Amino acid sequence: VIEKFDYVFAENGTVQYKNGQLVSKQAIQDHLGEELLQDLINFCLNYMALLKLPKKRGTFIEFRNGMLNISPIGRSCTPEERIEFSELDKKERIREKFVAALQREFAGKGLRFSRGGMISFDVFPEGWDKRYCLDVLDDERFDTIHFFGNETTPGGNDYEIYDDPRTVGHSVQSPQDTVQRCREIFFPERANEC
């Protein structure tokens, strides 16, 4: 994939490729330090140990270069379990309460929290949201930068870049919706193709 595009920004833009070559890669552990990182991970593990959910699966904390992805049910849940947790989360606000507890515990530590998808949320250093890539793109002086995302409301992991004045934000619901919106915007003569 990275060879097909001029730029690829992974993990909130903290891993950057240009013309298929790795340009920059940030590491959350280098930025936060091991002590804060372990305090954060330990707090999350303790919090999740006390959660009573209909189901729990594996991979509750996924360590990535630019963030931690926290999933109370576990990332290895089945698609059906994902939907079940999402419905429960809408009613009981499990992730919202978890994030509120983290915000209290780690106030002033330079951390941000954002909802990601149906079963998880992301934890990353302030300034490491999806706008991170825009500074690189500013240097290229593009006329327009379009962003497509599904978590575009406040608290969602797409909100900041969706709302940034340097982008034209598009809220989408699925990969198919994204393809359709791209056709409408960039290839209007093909907008009605399947």
Annotate the PLM regions:
Residues 9-10, 115, 171:
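Structural signal for conserved beta-strand scaffold positions within catalytic alpha/beta enzyme cores
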Residues 1-59:
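Active-site phosphate-binding/coordination module
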Residues 124-194:
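Mg2+-dependent phosphoryl-transfer enzymes with acidic/Ser/Thr/Gly-rich catalytic loops
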Residues 14-18, 119-122, 176-180:
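A short acidic, often aromatic-flanked loop/helix-cap motif at beta-alpha or helix-coil junctions
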Residues 13-14, 73-77, 153:
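Short connector loops/turns at beta-strand edges and beta->alpha or beta->beta junctions
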